[in-house]
Swiss-Prot record:
Bridged cysteine pairs (disulfide): none
Protein's name in the database: Large ribosomal subunit protein uL18
Subunit structure: Component of the large ribosomal subunit (LSU).
An MF annotation (GO) of this entry: 5S rRNA binding
Job of this protein: Component of the ribosome, a large ribonucleoprotein complex responsible for the synthesis of proteins in the cell. The small ribosomal subunit (SSU) binds messenger RNAs (mRNAs) and translates the encoded message by selecting cognate aminoacyl-transfer RNA (tRNA) molecules. The large subunit (LSU) contains the ribosomal catalytic site termed the peptidyl transferase center (PTC), which catalyzes the formation of peptide bonds, thereby polymerizing the amino acids delivered by tRNAs into a polypeptide chain.
Record localization: Cytoplasm; Nucleus
Pfam family, one: Ribosomal_L5e
Similarity comment: Belongs to the universal ribosomal protein uL18 family.
InterPro entries per record: Rbsml_uL18_euk, Ribosomal_uL18_C_euk
CDD domains documented for this protein: Ribosomal_L18_L5e (cd00432)
Gene Ontology cellular-component annotations: cytosolic large ribosomal subunit; nucleus
Length: 297
């Protein structure tokens, strides 16, 4: 069949059906969302949980959510801006930070569901594949599916670092090693050591050493926050190891205590009370009377 030009006449516009709002805005992939939210009919009211990972310029967001008619409901959430509490004060958007955020989410969720002692995950971070083993004499492992949104699922992407952290934290997420750093597409082999190096930010440490030797000025500029906080290339791995232990020890969200009340800014005049309005009228009358007396005199 040859090319048929669409005739945009009255009948075309009369029958035209617009796409969903979030599709028009380019925010939601409904093809993927349908498959991530629709549950098997035999499971009745059991929701299908999703691990939502979103990246921004300054933050990494990890959420566990499920879909309802009125909208999605968030069960638990963790953010990379919480990591300074655990000793990670710099590099809050790199692969290692994504892993820590996923680990924090998993431990926080399991503690919320009182499954943290039953499913501890793995404490040996070797970068290799790990899957949670379910217990026969207790509740099953928490199962969810990775929701990447509109992000490109390239090998070594940070979204898979967050997923790996959640899996090591004790969540049951179907996955393979094909998208982790260290997977070679040509030989179809996976090098777990390369993945481990990314989890502990060895690639950043190596770049720090190279830049410090060859371009000291650029090193001072690019790693100014590392220098300010006294973080060296040799101490990065130890920093992340301590952070993993601290996250497992206390995954609870820290309550924000406001020490001082915010200063309210007002851009319009405050509304006068009845007594203030009457007093204002009296003042206007008095000033007007005074002007009349001055002109007569």
């Amino acid at each position: 069949m040859g090319f048929v030009k669409v005739v945009k006449n009255k009948q075309y516009f009369k029958r035209f059906q617009v796409k969903y709002k979030r599709r028009r805005e380019g925010k939601t992939d409904y093809y993927a969302r349908k498959r991530l939210t629709v549950q098997d009919k035999s499971k009745y009211n059991t929701p299908k949980y999703r691990l939502i990972v979103r990246l921004s310029n300054k933050d990494i967001t990890c959420q566990i959510a499920y879909s309802r008619i009125e909208g999605d409901r968030i069960v638990c959430a963790a953010y990379s801006h919480e990591l300074p509490k655990y000793g990670i004060k710099v590099g809050l958007t790199n692969y290692a930070a994504a892993y820590c955020t996923g680990l924090l989410l998993a431990r926080r969720l399991l503690k919320q569901l009182k499954l943290d002692t039953l499913y501890t995950g793995t404490t040996e971070v070797d970068g290799d594949e790990y899957n949670v083993e379910e217990h026969d004499d207790g509740p099953g492992a928490f199962r969810c599916y990775l929701d990447t949104g509109l992000m490109r699922t390239t090998t070594g992407a940070r979204i898979f670092g967050a997923m790996k952290g959640a899996v090591d934290g004790g969540l049951n997420i179907p996955h393979s090693t094909k998208r982790f750093p260290g997977y070679d597409n040509e030989s179809k082999s996976f090098n777990a050591d390369v993945h481990r190096q990314h989890i502990f930010a060895h690639h950043i440490a190596n770049y720090m050493k190279t830049l410090e030797e060859n371009e000291p000025e650029n090193f001072q500029r690019q790693f100014s926050q590392y220098i300010k906080n006294g973080i060296t290339a040799d101490g990065i791995e130890e920093m992340y190891k301590k952070a993993h232990e601290a996250i497992r020890a206390d995954p609870d969200r820290a309550e924000i205590v406001k020490t001082k009340e915010p200063v309210k800014k007002r851009w319009n005049r405050a509304k006068l009370t009845l007594s203030e309005r009457k007093d204002r009228v009296k003042q206007i009358k008095a000033s007007f009377q005074k002007k009349l007396e001055e002109t007569e005199a």
